[in-house]
């Protein structure tokens, strides 16, 4: 049973992203009105806007939370070619603002020459690290060496993807068996379309990221990409939002079967492909156990996908833009359905139209 709560977001333009914090009690939204808003959930379950400020001089494409171990920290990225890191400060006891909080900009990352289309904090076991991707086809990875000083970030890696980048996802696995890994999607729509998803892995010996795999079957523009939480699996699961929803498994090939020293090779299988949205899919998001995938698309619906014990993925629920379930939704979908959804109550936030995310 799903309960829908409509929120008057009060953004002055299209909302591109909605992000929940680790505990799910705080939410951040960003918009083409150049602002970010922070929302807090009250004991009664109502969401209240507790902060709103102009963050960039262009549309804000994405906003994301750091792990709370590092404090209340947000990152945002924009068409203005920058990414920014924000920290919430609580007024000191001798301050007129005692006990009141406000957000301060800790740094602006200005290395990109084009629109910065996504920003993601690395899994916390890697320390305080941040990845950005840009329309110029470069993924940049930054590190804050002193987590108490968020004004100092050093550019550690630049990864050239050869294609305009639209989205990134860190592999969340904290297993020592898995090297740090980042997946990159492209929404490049040029006719000489290459594969739109690349996966890069960190090599301890060279201290650089190297391309491990390319998903050759994904040739349509990719709008979102998400590794599932790992929870001890020996393989990885990757969801992709393109003209439909696709779920891939990546199973590492045993090291002795591959050339030593190079990046891990994977057996890649597509385990589900859903076109039930009958439209572009803009966002995919996993639950905390990596067992349920939510997708949203231009059909105005959020769809929920789950695998059964036979590893067949099914649609287990459909929510319309107003939050109401669609009749018979639990029967719909199979391992070849599709996905799509936007949520008017958050002004198409999950839809996140990428119009103009490139440099003009």
Curated annotation (Swiss-Prot):
Query: Where in or outside the cell?
Result: Chromosome, Centromere, Kinetochore; Nucleus, Nuclear pore complex; Lysosome membrane
Q: At what positions is Phosphoserine found?
A: 190
Skewed-composition ranges (Low complexity): 324-342
Q: Which GO terms describe its biological process?
A: attachment of mitotic spindle microtubules to kinetochore; cell division; cellular response to amino acid starvation; cellular response to nutrient levels; mitotic metaphase chromosome alignment; mRNA transport; nuclear pore organization; positive regulation of TORC1 signaling
What are the record keywords, sorted?
Cell cycle, Cell division, Centromere, Chromosome, Chromosome partition, Isopeptide bond, Kinetochore, Lysosome, Membrane, Mitosis, mRNA transport, Nuclear pore complex, Nucleus, Phosphoprotein, Protein transport, Repeat, Translocation, Transport, Ubl conjugation, WD repeat
Q: List the disulfide bonds.
A: none
Region feature Disordered, mapped onto this chain:
324-360
Output compositional bias ranges, type Polar residues. Answer: 343-354
Q: Where is this cross-link: Glycyl lysine isopeptide (Lys-Gly) (interchain with G-Cter in SUMO2)?
A: 12
Please provide, alphabetically and separated by semicolons, the GO molecular function terms listed in this UniProt record: structural molecule activity
| Main location per the UniProt record | nucleus
One Gene Ontology cellular component: nuclear pore outer ring
Q: Which PROSITE patterns match?
A: WD_REPEATS_2, WD_REPEATS_REGION
The stretches annotated as WD repeats are: 10-49, 55-96, 111-152, 160-210, 217-258, 276-315
The regulatory note on its activity is: The GATOR2 complex is negatively regulated by the upstream amino acid sensors CASTOR1 and SESN2, which sequester the GATOR2 complex in absence of amino acids. In the presence of abundant amino acids, GATOR2 is released from CASTOR1 and SESN2 and activated.
InterPro entries in alphabetical order: G-protein_beta_WD-40_rep, Sec13/Seh1_fam, WD40/YVTN_repeat-like_dom_sf, WD40_repeat_dom_sf, WD40_rpt
Family to which the UniProt record says this protein belongs: Belongs to the WD repeat SEC13 family.
Listed under subunit, the entry gives:
Component of the Nup107-160 subcomplex of the nuclear pore complex (NPC). The Nup107-160 subcomplex includes NUP160, NUP133, NUP107, NUP98, NUP85, NUP43, NUP37, SEH1 and SEC13. The SEH1 subunit appears to be only weakly associated with the Nup107-160 subcomplex. Component of the GATOR2 subcomplex, composed of MIOS, SEC13, SEH1L, WDR24 and WDR59. The GATOR2 complex interacts with CASTOR1 and CASTOR2; the interaction is negatively regulated by arginine. The GATOR2 complex interacts with SESN1, SESN2 and SESN3; the interaction is negatively regulated by amino acids.
What is the stated purpose of this protein? Component of the Nup107-160 subcomplex of the nuclear pore complex (NPC). The Nup107-160 subcomplex is required for the assembly of a functional NPC. The Nup107-160 subcomplex is also required for normal kinetochore microtubule attachment, mitotic progression and chromosome segregation. This subunit plays a role in recruitment of the Nup107-160 subcomplex to the kinetochore. As a component of the GATOR2 complex, functions as an activator of the amino acid-sensing branch of the mTORC1 signaling pathway. The GATOR2 complex indirectly activates mTORC1 through the inhibition of the GATOR1 subcomplex. GATOR2 probably acts as an E3 ubiquitin-protein ligase toward GATOR1. In the presence of abundant amino acids, the GATOR2 complex mediates ubiquitination of the NPRL2 core component of the GATOR1 complex, leading to GATOR1 inactivation. In the absence of amino acids, GATOR2 is inhibited, activating the GATOR1 complex.
- For this entry, the protein name equals Nucleoporin SEH1
Name the species this protein comes from.
Answer: Bos taurus
Its lineage opens with: Eukaryota, Metazoa, Chordata, Craniata, Vertebrata
Originating gene: SEH1L
């Amino acid at each position: 049973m799903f309960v829908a709560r409509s929120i008057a977001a009060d953004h002055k333009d299209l909302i591109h992203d909605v992000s929940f914090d680790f505990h799910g009690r705080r939410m951040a939204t960003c918009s083409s009105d150049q602002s970010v808003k922070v929302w807090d959930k009250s004991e009664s379950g109502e969401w209240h806007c507790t902060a709103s400020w102009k963050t960039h001089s262009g549309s804000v494409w994405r906003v994301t939370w750091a792990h709370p171990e590092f404090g209340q920290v947000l990152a945002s990225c924009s068409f203005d070619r920058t990414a920014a890191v924000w920290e919430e400060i609580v007024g000191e006891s001798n301050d007129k603002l005692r006990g009141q909080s406000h957000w301060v900009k800790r740094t602006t990352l200005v290395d990109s020459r084009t629109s910065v289309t996504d920003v993601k904090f690395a899994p916390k076991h890697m320390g305080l690290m941040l990845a950005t991707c840009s329309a110029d086809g470069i993924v940049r990875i930054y590190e804050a060496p002193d987590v108490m000083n968020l004004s100092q970030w050093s550019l550690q890696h630049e990864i050239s993807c050869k294609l305009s980048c639209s989205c990134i996802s860190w592999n969340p696995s904290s297993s020592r068996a898995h090297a740090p890994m980042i997946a990159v999607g492209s929404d490049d729509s040029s006719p000489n379309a290459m594969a739109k998803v690349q996966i890069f892995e960190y090599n301890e010996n060279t201290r650089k990221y190297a391309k491990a795999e390319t998903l050759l079957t994904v040739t349509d523009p990719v709008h979102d990409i998400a590794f599932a939480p790992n929870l001890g699996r020996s393989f990885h699961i990757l969801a992709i939002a393109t003209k439909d929803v696709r779920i891939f498994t990546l199973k590492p090939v045993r090291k002795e079967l591959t050339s030593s020293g190079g990046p891990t090779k994977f057996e890649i299988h597509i385990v589900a492909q859903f076109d039930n949205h009958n439209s572009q899919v803009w966002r995919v998001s996993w639950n905390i156990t990596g067992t349920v995938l939510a997708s949203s698309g231009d059909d105005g619906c959020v769809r929920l996908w789950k695998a059964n014990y036979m590893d067949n993925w099914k649609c287990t629920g459909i929510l319309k833009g107003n939050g109401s379930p669609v009749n018979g939704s639990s029967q719909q979908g199979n391992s070849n359905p599709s996905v799509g959804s936007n949520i008017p109550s958050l002004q198409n936030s999950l839809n996140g139209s990428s119009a103009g995310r490139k440099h003009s």
